[in-house]
């Protein structure tokens, strides 16, 4: 064996590099593969769309907000889900209310504008507006959401 291969310095330099490649190669290949597939097939880019959730005090407020979001192209679709029960602490007191939930499909880039619109028309002092990125779903539906809500 060549003396350089038996030296401790050689192995201390080689092993961290091998470990890095061992752990990072699958991640790098996955990322490159997803990007290549997306470019080749014009398919959905994970996280480019979001589902946002807003609670409302009643059906009238919920439908008004839903219509406003769709009319302003801040959402492609809003599901109005009646009669949810919310239990939360507010100003030191445990509260329980019947509310209406909006499930909103939009572009992730529009979540800030969507939030500002909801805050401007919502009757609550502190309204709930939260969002989660959409990782995957029915490709034709996701394309439709992207087509309806402009960049």
From Swiss-Prot:
Coiled coil spans: none
UniProt-listed Pfam families: CutA1
One GO term of the biological process aspect: response to metal ion
Annotated Gene3D superfamilies: 3.30.70.120
Key word Transferase present: no
Protein keywords: Signal
Signal peptide: 1-36
Tagged with keyword Signal: yes
Annotated GO MF terms: copper ion binding
Subunit structure: Homotrimer.
UniProt record similarity statement: Belongs to the CutA family.
Protein name in the entry: Protein CutA homolog
Lineage of source species: Eukaryota, Metazoa, Chordata, Craniata, Vertebrata
Gene name for this UniProt entry: cuta
């Amino acid at each position: 064996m060549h003396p350089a291969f038996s030296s401790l310095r050689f192995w201390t330099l080689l092993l961290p590099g091998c470990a890095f490649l061992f752990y990072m190669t699958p991640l790098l290949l996955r990322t490159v593969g997803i990007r290549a597939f997306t470019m080749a097939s014009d398919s959905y880019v994970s996280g480019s769309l979001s589902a946002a959730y807003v609670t409302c005090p009643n059906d009238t407020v919920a439908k008004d907000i839903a219509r406003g979001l769709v009319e302003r192209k801040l959402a492609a679709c809003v599901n109005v889900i009646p009669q949810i029960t919310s239990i939360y602490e507010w100003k030191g007191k445990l509260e329980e209310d019947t509310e209406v939930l909006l499930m909103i499909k939009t572009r992730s880039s529009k979540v800030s504008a969507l939030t500002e619109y909801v805050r401007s028309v919502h009757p609550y002092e502190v309204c709930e507006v939260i969002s989660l990125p959409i990782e995957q779903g029915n490709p034709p539906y996701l394309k439709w959401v992207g087509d309806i809500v402009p960049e």
